[in-house]
């Protein structure tokens, strides 16, 4: 189980990403715009750098919904490999069963 503080930190990051998403996107459009002046582009870069680090979506980490485990995360289920196996063996995931050939 992950520490509660780690889960809380990820939740905080998710809120910051949602809060600053539009602002970051607008600044990135200005930065990548070839027709914008160098001064405007530079100012956009400075404004982007002044935003909180945790507002970047690349700082988010996928975590298991049940345990908070960061490694072995399966996007399709939102769970770690361990919890997917446990729930599969109990028959709690419809249509999923152990492979045998």
UniProtKB/Swiss-Prot annotation:
Entry's Gene Ontology molecular function annotations: rRNA binding; structural constituent of ribosome
One Pfam family recorded for the sequence: Ribosomal_S14
GO cellular component, one term: small ribosomal subunit
InterPro entries (alphabetical): Ribosomal_uS14, Ribosomal_uS14_bac/plastid, Ribosomal_uS14_CS
PROSITE patterns: RIBOSOMAL_S14
Top-rank taxon: Bacteria
Keywords carried by this UniProt record: Ribonucleoprotein, Ribosomal protein, RNA-binding, rRNA-binding
GO BP term, example: translation
Quaternary structure (record): Part of the 30S ribosomal subunit. Contacts proteins S3 and S10.
HAMAP family reported in the protein's UniProt record: Ribosomal_uS14_1 (MF_00537)
Function: Binds 16S rRNA, required for the assembly of 30S particles and may also be responsible for determining the conformation of the 16S rRNA at the A site.
Family: Belongs to the universal ribosomal protein uS14 family.
Protein name (record): Small ribosomal subunit protein uS14
Gene that encodes it: rpsN
């Amino acid at each position: 189980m992950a520490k509660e503080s780690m889960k809380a930190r990820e939740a905080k990051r998710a809120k910051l990403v949602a809060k600053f998403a539009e602002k970051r996107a607008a600044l990135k459009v200005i930065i990548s715009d070839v027709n914008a002046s160098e001064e405007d582009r530079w100012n956009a870069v400075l404004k982007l750098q002044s935003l909180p680090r945790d507002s970047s979506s690349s700082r988010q980490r996928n975590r298991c919904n049940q345990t908070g485990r960061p490694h072995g995360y399966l996007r399709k289920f939102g769970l770690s490999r361990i919890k997917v196996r446990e729930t599969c063996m109990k028959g709690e995931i419809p249509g999923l069963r152990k492979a045998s050939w």
